[in-house]
């Protein structure tokens, strides 16, 4: 009997979250923090056997678990991971550890509830990446909204209620069509098994409707232009930990949905809609990058840069050649970009949080000369700013570079437009860094700053290691996903239109 590692990865953080919640009284804040940290670390350790035991040479689902759950509607508790999803599970658990540490001294009210929300959210997000049953996917996908809604709405900034409500409404409205699509697929195939849906022939009109239904749910989550407007508000109002999880993991749920649903279930519609998807992705990459350039609020700037970086991901998914094959290099680059963005965006939001905790302002104008008072912090901040701009040898470069290489094979002009983002990305990242960190000390707030403490340096150090290792040695990441990416590309290249009698 093999260990149910995936079930443990999902339910251990949720159970620790419930345990933390039971320590809800304020005199037990210290204990609640330690229980939450223990839960987050144990949850991360559970994901290590998944990586070590994963066989990258096959595209088959691994660590499979299947139990009857709701036999009346043929839904089962079915889990499994392949090369497309395996890395997101340790990434989620790793970011959760950092988030619990990030709120250690900063969050003073409702400490147990705050940490519990993140632990439960972590388990739910790991659930999204590891279920192979459509009904269960919908439940996990929607359930992630609730802890995030609470995190933004309770511990957020002055406009937190508006931001939380907008976030909830946007993402929920998008997902309603997905529920109809899932119900239709269950009705047509008689099962909720996602793998069976992948092989089920569908007429072109049906595929287009299904593609559109899934697009509404996933595009809002990514978020793609023009349904991205909830994201800057949510980021600006969210506490530091909330922004870290939102950017690092929650945006990936939508991109992952394209890989697991839109492309394999509706391949012919994916080809038909590819020009539209490429256009929307390029608008996100270029236009939203330019929007980031004029932001005065650091969190807004990084939020817009997140949308631009996720534009690279959707671009990499939808570049098909004449034979209908998606580009292997671009597809791998897009998935690497998802993982890298998890580290880099979490680091950027944490850096802004470190300064905000001291000065209580996110405005770029409130800073200047931070390097004089916080030299260690400024060094880490520089590394992450460079990674955000896509500097070679950082993780931010690998995915973007592969997508651009893939795009050159597909269409030179698309590659050229996509490559401009490296210039725009460097512009807004370095322009922000220059104004915040360099120059003379701007005011007495900056003069009184203290450098990052041990806890903050530990978080920055762990993220720096992740960004550099992935940037210099991406092979373990590409090796595990190779077989699964090729399998997906071959699957999407075959038409699923029913044969005419």
What label would you give each PLM region?
Residues 1-5, 19-116, 191-199, 487:
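Transmembrane helix-loop-helix hairpins at membrane boundaries of multipass inner-membrane proteins
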Residues 8-23, 37-50, 91-103, 121-123, ...:
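Central hydrophobic cores of alpha-helical transmembrane segments in multi-pass inner-membrane proteins
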Residues 29-41, 162-172, 374-378, 454-462:
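Alpha-helical transmembrane segments and their helix-start/interface "positive-inside/aromatic belt" motifs
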Residues 38-53, 171-180, 387, 423, ...:
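Hydrophobic alpha-helical membrane-insertion segments
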Residues 98-105, 123-135, 148-432:
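Hydrophobic transmembrane alpha-helices and their helix-loop junctions in integral membrane proteins
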Residues 101-117, 240, 248, 445-455:
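Cytoplasmic juxtamembrane regions at transmembrane-helix boundaries
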Residues 142:
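Short phosphate-coordinating micro-motif centered on Lys-Gly-acidic
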Residues 374-376, 430-501:
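Cytoplasmic/organellar membrane-interface segments at the starts of transmembrane helices
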